């Protein structure tokens, strides 16, 4: 998987970091990959089986569960992790590989991981 990403900006650097991480991390049916995508306003977390190329479970701050949520973005990210863990347990998933998507493991990305752990997922 050699992807040429040109540019000097933050988005290009993020894509280069994510490409480096994806060389080493892949999800299987037994241990799928938990992918975290972060924007300025929202968080998206998906559990993906890379062998089948399918998203097994997903949760986001864009979903109906967050229509009346009042709190900080970090609190919302933690709730995303907790709700994702609940959906994953219902689907029979207990362990995952964490893919931070090229972002630093800090703040909202770490909050998603903490929420998933508190919800019962093993990262």
From Swiss-Prot:
Assigned GO CC terms: cytosolic large ribosomal subunit
Gene Ontology BP terms: translation
Keyword Ribosomal protein tagged: yes
Disulphides: none
Coiled-coil annotated residue ranges, if any: none
Record keywords, A-Z: Ribonucleoprotein, Ribosomal protein, RNA-binding, rRNA-binding
Keyword Ribosomal protein part of the UniProt annotation: yes
One GO molecular-function entry: structural constituent of ribosome
NCBIfam families reported in the protein's UniProt record: L18_bact
Alphabetical list of HAMAP family matching this protein: Ribosomal_uL18_B (MF_01337_B)
Family statement drawn from the similarity comment of this UniProt entry: Belongs to the universal ribosomal protein uL18 family.
Quaternary structure and interacting proteins, as annotated: Part of the 50S ribosomal subunit; part of the 5S rRNA/L5/L18/L25 subcomplex. Contacts the 5S and 23S rRNAs.
Function in brief: This is one of the proteins that bind and probably mediate the attachment of the 5S RNA into the large ribosomal subunit, where it forms part of the central protuberance.
Protein name: Large ribosomal subunit protein uL18
Upper classification of the organism: Bacteria, Bacillati, Actinomycetota, Actinomycetes, Bifidobacteriales
Originating gene: rplR
């Amino acid at each position: 998987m050699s992807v040429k990403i040109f540019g000097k900006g933050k988005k290009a650097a993020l894509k280069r970091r994510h490409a480096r991480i994806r060389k080493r991390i892949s999800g299987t049916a037994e241990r799928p990959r938990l992918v975290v995508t972060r924007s300025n306003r929202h968080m998206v977390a998906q559990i993906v089986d890379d062998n089948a190329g399918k998203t097994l479970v997903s949760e986001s701050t864009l979903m109906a569960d967050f229509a009346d949520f009042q709190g900080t973005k970090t609190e919302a990210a933690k709730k995303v992790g907790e709700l994702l863990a609940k959906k994953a347990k219902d689907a029979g998933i207990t362990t995952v590989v964490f893919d931070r998507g090229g972002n630093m493991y800090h703040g909202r990305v770490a909050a998603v991981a903490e929420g998933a752990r508190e919800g019962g997922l093993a990262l």
